[in-house]
From Swiss-Prot:
The gene is rpiB. It catalyses: aldehydo-D-ribose 5-phosphate = D-ribulose 5-phosphate. It holds the Pfam family LacAB_rpiB. The lineage of its organism: Bacteria, Bacillati, Mycoplasmatota, Mycoplasmoidales, Mycoplasmoidaceae. Pathway: Carbohydrate degradation; pentose phosphate pathway; D-ribose 5-phosphate from D-ribulose 5-phosphate (non-oxidative stage): step 1/1. InterPro entries: RpiB, RpiB_LacA_LacB, RpiB_LacA_LacB_sf. Keywords: Carbohydrate metabolism, Isomerase. One of its GO terms (molecular function) is ribose-5-phosphate isomerase activity. PANTHER family: DNA DAMAGE-REPAIR_TOLERATION PROTEIN DRT102, RIBOSE-5-PHOSPHATE ISOMERASE B. Belongs to the LacAB/RpiB family. This is Probable ribose-5-phosphate isomerase B. It comes from the Bacteria. Its EC number is 5.3.1.6. One of its GO terms (biological process) is D-allose catabolic process. It comes from Mycoplasma pneumoniae (strain ATCC 29342 / M129 / Subtype 1). Homodimer.
Amino acid sequence: MQMNHPIYIASDHTGLELKSLVIKHLEQQKLQVIDLGPTELDPLDDYPDYAFLLAQTMQANPNSLGILICGTGVGVCMAANKAKGILAALVVDSKTAALARQHDDANVLCLSSRFVVPEENIKIVDEFLQAQFEGGRHSKRVGKIIAYEREK
């Protein structure tokens, strides 16, 4: 797997341990990973802060990919999707991970640290990063999402 851009990653306190495992896995594959935090456990941190930081970083670095982690994956996904240009997908299995990229052109993968075991999350990350947007009929659909976002 080769990436032309770094992979940005962030979590809240519940995703800190999984984030470390994902970073180690990706670095073993010689991928450039930029950790946007947190770097230490703070049970009072707030997932929107990290989701917004990752989204802003990606907006400044077009065509990049990101990974967000919280307990369910729902909160970081909701927060990230508020940012223009972000197409975040909560994924809990490897098949959906591939389809999120192939059909929906997702650029942020959101993971659950509480309800998906680490080994499955690693498979999800690999599938997501290996998949490519297929375009075709999917371009029209994703285009509608982007057009709606621009109108608002």
